[in-house]
A protein has these predicted regions:
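Catalytic-pocket segment enriched in acidic/His residues
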Residues: 1-101
């Protein structure tokens, strides 16, 4: 861990996504797609993951579960522009930020 690690953006309510097994997500850095994924490609479904985790830990509203990342992860540089898109069934959710120098 280091200062500024694991920043979290605005939340999407779980009820906003109708089918969690059909969600696509993408991360662009400086306009180039660096990561892209689809929840249908997960080894275990989100429901299975939460069920398994809840056998060992108490899950509460607002808890964050982190499972890893698709290929393409790499170091960020000062002033990099980041854009994250979560494609839901009825709308897309988009977050943008930049890496402070």
């Amino acid at each position: 861990a280091f200062d500024g690690a694991c920043l979290l953006g605005d939340w999407v309510e779980a009820t906003e996504i109708k089918a969690w097994d059909q969600v696509q997500y993408q991360l662009e850095i400086n306009g180039q797609v660096r990561q892209a994924g689809d929840t249908s490609l997960l080894i275990f479904s989100i429901a299975e993951l939460l069920l398994d985790i809840s056998q060992s830990f108490s899950l509460q509203p607002g808890d964050v579960v982190m499972t890893g990342t698709p290929a393409g992860v790499g170091a960020l540089q000062p002033n990099d522009q980041l854009k994250m898109t979560l494609k839901g069934q009825s709308q897309d959710f988009v977050w943008s930020t930049c890496v402070k120098a």
